[in-house]
Amino acid sequence: MALLIEDKKQIVAEVSEVASKAFAAVVADYQGLSVEQLTTLRVEARKLGVTTRIVRNTLAKRAFQGTQFDILNDNLVGPTILGFSTSEDDMGAAARLFEEFAKTNKAFELKAAAFDGKVYQGADVSVIANLPNQEKALTMLASVLQAPISKLGRLITALKEKNESEAA
């Protein structure tokens, strides 16, 4: 079905707005998936705060102009679904969602992802997918900071016990 110019402009504006607020974007080929499978993907995306769109490639290229995701334009070939991580707390959510979905749906193929001005092709999308969310990152930081303090505490206790045993 042919889209009217007004409809195309609206789609470009919507995608451009989401892209300008997103921290990461993922591009995947959905050819061969059923409507039911795509609906499942979209439901999971909503749960994670990920925005997904199926847009014509030329419209996506126009929408990406002036955003950090214009570096993905070379990957906009064939049937394409876009995923955007818009949550500051979980910047890798879209990549993680698409990667997990690709594991269970062989027809779903990751093309590329963009994060922080860099493009990750195919299997390298896992770099973004493995980014910890904010809670996990803070937990990792706390454990790294806690380890030296624990060692110091054990050292002081050992020295105290040694001094007590020598005094006795």
Curated annotation (Swiss-Prot):
InterPro entries attached to this UniProt entry: Ribosomal_uL10, Ribosomal_uL10-like_sf, Ribosomal_uL10_bac, Ribosomal_uL10_bac_type, Ribosomal_uL10_CS_bac
GO MF annotations in UniProt: large ribosomal subunit rRNA binding; structural constituent of ribosome
GO CC annotations on file: large ribosomal subunit
Assigned keywords, A-Z: Ribonucleoprotein, Ribosomal protein, RNA-binding, rRNA-binding
Listed Pfam families: Ribosomal_L10 (PF00466)
GO biological process, one term: translation
Alphabetical list of NCBIfam families matching this protein: PRK00099.1-1
Stated role: Forms part of the ribosomal stalk, playing a central role in the interaction of the ribosome with GTP-bound translation factors.
Quaternary organization: Part of the ribosomal stalk of the 50S ribosomal subunit. The N-terminus interacts with L11 and the large rRNA to form the base of the stalk. The C-terminus forms an elongated spine to which L12 dimers bind in a sequential fashion forming a multimeric L10(L12)X complex.
Similarity annotation: Belongs to the universal ribosomal protein uL10 family.
Protein name per UniProt: Large ribosomal subunit protein uL10
Annotated source species: Acinetobacter baumannii (strain ATCC 17978 / DSM 105126 / CIP 53.77 / LMG 1025 / NCDC KC755 / 5377)
